[in-house]
Amino acid sequence: MQTQARPPVPQGPRFNHPATPQQVRRPINAPLPGQTAQIQGNRGPQPPKKKKRYADKLIQPKVRELVPESQAYMDLLAFEQKLDSTITRKKIDVQEALKRPQKIKKRLRIYISHTFIAGKEPEKEGDDASVPMWELRVEGRLLDDMQHPTVGANPRPAPKRKFSSFFKSLVIELDKDIYGPDNHLVEWHRTPQTNETDGFQVKRPGDRPVKCTILLLLDYQPMKFKLHPRLAKVLGIAAETRPRIIEALWQYIKTHKLQDPQDRDTINNDLFLEQCFGVSKMRFMEIPQRLHQLLQQPDPLVLNHIIQRPDDGQDKTSACYDIDVELEDPVKQQMANFVHNQTNANDIQLLDQKIFDLVDQINEMKLRRDFFLRFSNEPSGFIKKWVVSQNSDLKTLTESSGDGESDRYATTYSTTDTDEGVSRYMYQKIQQKRAELEQSLGIRNN
């Protein structure tokens, strides 16, 4: 046979089944070389690039049969999918945990000390005399900061909290008999413009022993409330945040089955709750309002101290007290960083795009291989099928699709499928209009 066949174009054909002529048909978007310029000139704007999916990373089973080593890639792909799902699930768990307040308890050591400054007599005329004075200092720090000092191995240590940041207010009450009713109180209250400090200092003239009372009100975040003694005894908590108090009350109601069996929104108070709220029944929505009357500001810390000279019978001039304070869990910041970490997102996208491109190249190579394999097995028959396919594609590219003359007549569309589709459509419309009419007339169809 002397017929010379033109070799296939580099792109190679796209096909579906090995036994049909369509398997060697050139795709519509790959015209003959002579027609490329004409087709591209008639194209409109390019559609947006299709987003790749996980399925686009998969290698076809026929490729895996030809290359058994590709199974290792599929195993890595399955492991990556499992790892991604695990990370996503953990991020969701972390996000839920971040919504809840996370506090840790630490011990704050408060130091109270005083010193005396002796007065000076004028050495000669014209010199100013100074009266004796005392200075009271209230300081403090966390015990963890003292036991675990910052070492050089940590380049960015966590910032230490100032002593004043733990309190909402501080009041020092001095002896009223000595300093009078107008000068015996020293107060500090937190404001939005407050600058935090590591301690407080108070200076006053005098060298006599002075009794002072230090009142410290802790700054709870979120705010805590002190419960009425009766309610505190019932719930077993003395001071807590409002949501925790409501939760504890609800648990008490559920445990003692105080919900009305007929009206679940009604609470039948037992003897103890009736003594607290003053009613035998109450609506569930009334609980926050009634509970507000039983909540008070927490009591301040009261520290008593005597300012006097050591030689007046006192061996020490300082005292320390340990109290428990609540701090934000440092792990919470690490959890937030984990959720919002996008450091490697761009690198992962670039690597995914490389994988997509490589898989596309592998699939394209598989098409070319099948093309040339069929050509080598049966050259003459393959060329005939390929020419027929190219001829069909050429007609599709150069002629308008469809038969315009036959499309003008109704007999073209008169088929059993068309009749059934029209009947179903009309029946559906009739039922829809009937339902609208019955609804407007108030007729209920049983």
From Swiss-Prot:
Q: Which UniProt keywords apply?
A: Chromatin regulator, Nucleus, Transcription, Transcription regulation
The superkingdom of the source organism is: Eukaryota
Write down what this protein is called: SWI/SNF chromatin-remodeling accessory subunit 1
A Pfam family annotated for this UniProt entry: SWIB
Q: Where in the cell is it found?
A: Nucleus
Q: Does the keyword Transmembrane apply?
A: no
Relate the assembly described in the record: Component of the multiprotein chromatin-remodeling complexes SWI/SNF: SWI/SNF-A (BAF), SWI/SNF-B (PBAF) and related complexes. The canonical complex contains a catalytic subunit swsn-4, core subunits swsn-1 and swsn-5, and accessory subunits swsn-3, swsn-6, phf-10, dpff-1, swsn-9 and either ham-3/swsn-2.1 or swsn-2.2. May interact with blmp-1.
Q: What does this protein do?
A: Involved in transcriptional activation and repression of select genes by chromatin remodeling (alteration of DNA-nucleosome topology). Component of SWI/SNF chromatin remodeling complexes that carry out key enzymatic activities, changing chromatin structure by altering DNA-histone contacts within a nucleosome in an ATP-dependent manner. Required for the blmp-1-mediated transcriptional activation or repression of several hypodermal genes such as bed-3. Involved in regulating differentiation, migration and axon pathfinding of specific serotonergic neurons (HSNs).
What changes when the gene is disrupted? Answer: RNAi-mediated knockdown at the L1 larval stage reduces brood size. RNAi-mediated knockdown reduces expression of tph-1, which encodes a component of the serotonin synthesis pathway. RNAi-mediated knockdown reduces the level of bed-3 and col-124 mRNAs and increases the level of lin-29 mRNA. Simultaneous knockouts of swsn-2.2 do not survive beyond the L2 larval stage. Simultaneous RNAi-mediated knockdown of swsn-2.2 at the L1 larval stage causes sterility, while at the L3 larval stage, causes embryonic lethality for the progeny.
